[in-house]
């Protein structure tokens, strides 16, 4: 479609009406092909934001992004077990340690297949990719090498800009608007590995159930969409609102640290810093030398991932498995193995 042919779709939007999934996919296909005027793009994104994006519209935008992504060669040996992503939208306004990224190493060391889709920082000083770079992990490794890492090590990291080149066309508009748009929730939905399982944190409690419905529409098998007392993670400092997708149904409930078998901590205990500082904290956690608050925050998130993958019968049992895995040092060994294997792409 050209910019001229999408005008009828824009007219629907500007009248305050909702688009279908297919119509939204058409609009976003034009955008990521670089064929949409920046003024038109800004108007489209703001029209969606002001009315409030529907499940169909978010799903359609994700469809377009997934279709245009660089393909990821899913290893056949992982298909029977299934793959999980542990990811957050970012944008929660807190500068915490890298909980979900560290949890990915723990879950993988405990037996889960983890394909983590990540980017540079959104709201904190250190996003998942910022952290990984500190350990010498090559973010631009080929899809084939990433697939090998997933098969051999149970873990790979997929750097979003490496797979979704078309997103660059929206960057100037997003920077000019300086407000959240649909793009702020799209990142976790467009993992090129298309994981069967998702632990997805969102920056607002209002997004928990809608994003669970989007995952349902996109065909995700099992998922927990969470918002933890202000964080886009499972919370150690308070309650966590959950929408769990299981057997095609969505169940809503709350979890507290007690449900995981760990004590509550204050949010200030989870404060992070620059990538180098956060890397040191991650290293300490994975070596089994982290402080209790840091270790528990990572374990409860890894525990939920292990529960979703079917490696534990409950989030409490998953947390116990995560804690015991940390003590073995296997997660720290995995960190070094991934750095070594990823460096092959630089040779």
Swiss-Prot record:
The keyword Cell membrane does not apply. Homodimer. The lineage of its organism: Bacteria, Pseudomonadati, Pseudomonadota, Gammaproteobacteria, Alteromonadales. This is Anthranilate phosphoribosyltransferase. Mg(2+) 1 binds at residues 100, 233. Anthranilate 1 binds at residues 88, 119. Its EC number is 2.4.2.18. GO terms for molecular function: anthranilate phosphoribosyltransferase activity; magnesium ion binding. InterPro entries: Anthranilate_Pribosyl_Tfrase, Glycosyl_Trfase_fam3, Glycosyl_Trfase_fam3_N_dom, Glycosyl_Trfase_fam3_N_dom_sf, Nuc_phospho_transferase. GO terms for biological process: L-tryptophan biosynthetic process. It is an enzyme of class 2 (transferase). Coiled coil: none annotated. Mg(2+) 2 binds at residues 232-233.
């Amino acid at each position: 479609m050209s910019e001229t042919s999408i005008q009828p779709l824009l007219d629907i939007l500007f009248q305050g009406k909702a688009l279908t999934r297919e119509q939204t996919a058409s609009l976003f296909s034009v955008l990521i092909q670089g064929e949409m005027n920046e003024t038109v793009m800004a108007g489209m994104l703001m029209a969606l934001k002001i009315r409030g994006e529907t499940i169909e519209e978010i799903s359609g935008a994700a469809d377009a992004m997934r279709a245009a992504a660089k393909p990821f060669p899913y290893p056949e040996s992982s298909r029977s077990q299934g793959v999980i992503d542990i990811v957050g939208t970012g944008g929660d306004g807190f500068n915490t340690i890298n909980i979900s990224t560290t949890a990915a190493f723990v879950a993988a060391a405990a037996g889960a297949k983890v394909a983590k889709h990540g980017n540079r920082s959104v709201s904190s000083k250190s996003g998942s990719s910022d952290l990984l770079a500190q350990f010498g992990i090559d973010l631009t490794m080929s899809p084939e090498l990433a697939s090998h890492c997933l098969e051999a090590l149970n873990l790979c990291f997929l750097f979003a800009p490496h797979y979704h080149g078309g997103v660059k066309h929206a960057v100037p508009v997003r920077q000019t608007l300086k407000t959240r748009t649909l793009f702020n929730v799209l990142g976790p939905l467009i993992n090129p590995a298309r994981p069967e399982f998702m632990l997805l944190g969102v920056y607002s409690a209002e997004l928990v159930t809608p994003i669970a419905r989007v995952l349902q529409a996109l065909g995700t098998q099992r998922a927990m969409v969470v918002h933890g007392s202000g964080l886009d993670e499972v919370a150690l400092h308070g309650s966590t609102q959950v929408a769990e997708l299981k057997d095609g149904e969505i169940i809503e409930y709350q979890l507290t640290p007690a449900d995981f078998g760990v004590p509550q901590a204050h949010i200030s205990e989870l404060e992070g810093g620059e990538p180098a500082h956060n890397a040191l904290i991650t290293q300490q956690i994975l070596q089994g030398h982290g402080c209790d608050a840091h270790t528990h925050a990572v374990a409860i998130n890894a525990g939920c991932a292990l529960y979703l993958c079917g490696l534990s019968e409950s989030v409490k049992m998953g947390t116990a498995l995560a804690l015991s895995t940390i003590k073995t040092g296997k997660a720290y060994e995995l960190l070094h193995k991934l750095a070594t294997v990823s460096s092959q792409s630089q040779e």
